[in-house]
Amino acid sequence: MKHKLLKLLLLVELVILGVTLNQQVKAEEAYDITKVVATAWVKSDGSLIMKRQITYDFNDDVHGVYYQQNLAKHQEIKDLHIAVQDNNEEPQAATNYSVKQTAEGDRFKVYHPVSEDSRLTVTYDYRITNAITNYQDTAELNFMIIGNNWNTDLDHVTASVIFPGPVKQLKAWAHGSLNGAIRVLPNQGKIIMTADNLNGKTGIEVHTIFPVSVTAANKNIVRHKHRQAVLRQEAKLANEANQKRLRGRIINWILIVLGLISGLAAIIKGFSVKKQGVTPEKDVGFNS
């Protein structure tokens, strides 16, 4: 029993050490991303007008930043504009940047020197073609609005999908952070997603369906029904997410209990060592 308890305490210590080391690694990045705001405006032709604002706090001197927009095979980026804002100055159009097409999408690199302890906000404006698919009974947008390949966590994230007006039968789901929130506002034609301390490898995916009339000019058409398949899929994913949340809560409680046991065992061990210690002999005086 004693050996089992020692093994259990060792496991708890290893878990705590792993969390501590992970936090130390994250702290060594050259920058923090304190804020990301991504807004997608839905257009009648099935494209999205995107605005991305990314705010960096730098811990070191750097020569620039980059962002990659992943794309499907039939999608393109049009009308790209980039602006940079140093600290609290007015935004300026970026003139020194490059765009590289990769197998995954387009990679934007902005050449802009930044010194240590500075803040930089980069704004990307562009259009993504063929972002929405029109089916016979619904239109669908399934889009990674916040990517999942960042080198650091994102402190505060807001992502929105905005329609031209109110949208009846608007349904939407967000996938990624289990601690995030989504608000679906059919009367305002908006979907708003928020998350704090978003893991850089998690991202946020928005999945929404709405009437085909919203994107009536869309030429990206699939001639079969799809709405019920989406509803079944999202019901399954919601159940899986709830099970994952439950497992997470159980693990947290187990770690808390193990921590209490570890602390209690340390206290008991301290008393036991004190009780079993050797009583020192009294000094004996002598004459020479």
Model regions: which residues?
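Gly/Thr-rich phosphate-binding loop signature of adenosyl cofactor/nucleotide-binding cores
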Residues: 272
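Lumenal/extracellular ectodomains and adaptor appendage modules
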Residues: 2-4, 21-170, 174-268, 277-288
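Bacterial N-terminal signal peptides
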Residues: 9-20
